[in-house]
Amino acid sequence: MEFSWLETRWARPFYLAFVFCLALGLLQAIKLYLRRQRLLRDLRPFPAPPTHWFLGHQKFIQDDNMEKLEEIIEKYPRAFPFWIGPFQAFFCIYDPDYAKTLLSRTDPKSQYLQKFSPPLLGKGLAALDGPKWFQHRRLLTPGFHFNILKAYIEVMAHSVKMMLDKWEKICSTQDTSVEVYEHINSMSLDIIMKCAFSKETNCQTNSTHDPYAKAIFELSKIIFHRLYSLLYHSDIIFKLSPQGYRFQKLSRVLNQYTDTIIQERKKSLQAGVKQDNTPKRKYQDFLDIVLSAKDESGSSFSDIDVHSEVSTFLLAGHDTLAASISWILYCLALNPEHQERCREEVRGILGDGSSITWDQLGEMSYTTMCIKETCRLIPAVPSISRDLSKPLTFPDGCTLPAGITVVLSIWGLHHNPAVWKNPKVFDPLRFSQENSDQRHPYAYLPFSAGSRNCIGQEFAMIELKVTIALILLHFRVTPDPTRPLTFPNHFILKPKNGMYLHLKKLSEC
């Protein structure tokens, strides 16, 4: 049978394309095979839990059950190799000496994990490395001086009181548990928008969720789903998927929102508007700080830098603090004796809570211990990661080669029975001055440590203290046993299906 002219004409190009694709696939398969062999060789000295040949250890994290990690920690008290699929492995550590060794260096953050973050964070302090990170850190540090932070206390208190007014109305109309995380999330967004932009969002008074908050929450879910879905690790496959399309759309929403506010402020400054002298501005917001920051040579942030740093402040400050506040309330609800002791302390310092000052926050010693113990028990950011730029040798002599991604499990460190006695027990006295002085300096790392520790940790502690103090002055919180909580293994530990607590208005206030 003879081939037609058309069949003959197209046969050769199709054949060549087939051979090319086959060769490309073969090269990729060889590359992946060699990568797996290298990882197996590098991680062989370290014992690990049994792993599935294809899925690796994914089941430990896909079940949203942090208790499985605790079981591993009891068996492997320092570290273990962690596989996601057959070709990607991390080295997970949760020992204070191991943590100190890692964080005392200047290894860059994991590029593999960084690609899962929203694009608008790609140039901010949280993602930068090397000289540019150092320059940004130096320029931003004055913005977190206590003289700047003091002015935020009144802003925070105002937003918290708006939330408490909502709770009072709810409690007067129903005798059921309240989903508090939604309210705390909106309140935290309200605070961060005011501190970042001096922007009134009305997100607490609106019956519908703020579009910005909705975009942030949905992005977080997409990032988590992509991280633990092997197919979506490919940038091409992810971008062509419905989730990838949604990811890009949500990122554009956030970019446009931030850009609009920045451009409005720059136009005002160029027009000579002295915003600090207007009645609504009693403080210097974060955007002011970023726009006015200059180093010794007079260099300032570029437009992209301004956008990235403001976005980082918004995202890092909103989500993590909403989660932390919620978990503190949850722990105090489960431990009423500690809740009552905190309330008595706050009453003795604040009275009716009509005003709150920097010095008063410093007097809340027991409340601070309860906040720290919650951040140990349920760290809002459960892990951080680094790509080793050179070989790393731990104090016990074990060595990792350059190129390995090391994940410091803060959850694992804070629940390591070799580090903490009875780690699942809520015990604020762990953070008394005496006990803190005796503890390993790298045993408690809710804000990381070393040169890359969280630049906003003082801001965070102020918001946590102000919020918890005012809530305890006006409400007693008790758990809802019909709605147990789980700890989903996300980038940020947030209540998976909301947080329901019983709220009782206190008549004394």
Curated annotation (Swiss-Prot):
It is a single-pass membrane protein. Its EC number is 1.14.14.-. It comes from the Eukaryota. GO terms for molecular function: anandamide 14,15 epoxidase activity; heme binding; iron ion binding. Keywords: Endoplasmic reticulum, Heme, Iron, Lipid metabolism, Membrane, Metal-binding, Microsome, Monooxygenase, Oxidoreductase, Transmembrane, Transmembrane helix. It is found in: Endoplasmic reticulum membrane; Microsome membrane. Pfam families: p450. The keyword Membrane applies. Its cofactor is heme. Belongs to the cytochrome P450 family. This is Cytochrome P450 4X1. It comes from Homo sapiens. The gene is CYP4X1.
